[in-house]
């Protein structure tokens, strides 16, 4: 699908991978709605690139319905959804203070996995009634997994479980939505230079980058966004989780 002229939704778009993805899609001609709970950050990014900022808690059905409705009224129904909203707290299952509070595990699952499914189901419901394009395609959904889905480290039980769920969701969703001409893909990024990592001391950033086989550096958000654009444009990419990690395989800690 050529994104030029089509409406797109990007969640978690106030910063990091989501912000850069929104910018790349706008440059490709898409009409982009930037969704985030951080509405001030989303507005700042939207003003910079020429998009529409909308507040949305992806774990809330009401929020998601309202945000998609507002985006649809401004840009028309979206043919592109990119799920970037997520959290990645590190906490051991059993620590010095005892077992991880169940609420903390549930929060990570709610945002990363349930939030992804919530946006996917609602966007797909809109896409299914659109006029088909080349190859009878009506839409494309790209979600964000993680290499932690495959090699979760100590302290990543909640995060790895949530991202493993996103990875596992991809193929059944692609199979189910194929009847409507909707593709479903996921990207599993490695260690990326998001604002959270860039806030670490330079020595820590260098150490993380050196752990990547090649190139020996942190991934750049633009590289993630460029892969999203490639997926959008490549109709035969469907039902796959693409690792974007410089051949990194995570150690236990």
Regions found by a protein language model. Name each.
Residues 2-32:
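Canonical Rossmann dinucleotide-binding motif of NAD(H)/NADP(H)-dependent dehydrogenases/reductases
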Residues 87, 98-118, 142, 166:
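Catalytic Tyr-X3-Lys loop
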Residues 88-106, 125, 129-135, 155-158, ...:
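Conserved mid-core segment of classical short-chain dehydrogenase/reductases
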Residues 120, 162, 170:
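Active-site helix of classical SDR
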Residues 125, 174-176:
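Alpha-helical segment proximal to the catalytic Tyr-Lys
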Residues 146:
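Residue(s) in the substrate-gating loop at a strand-loop-helix junction
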Residues 178-183, 237-240:
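Short, small/polar-rich loop/turn modules that mediate ligand/substrate recognition or access, typified
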Residues 220-244, 249:
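C-terminal substrate-recognition "lid" of short-chain dehydrogenase/reductases
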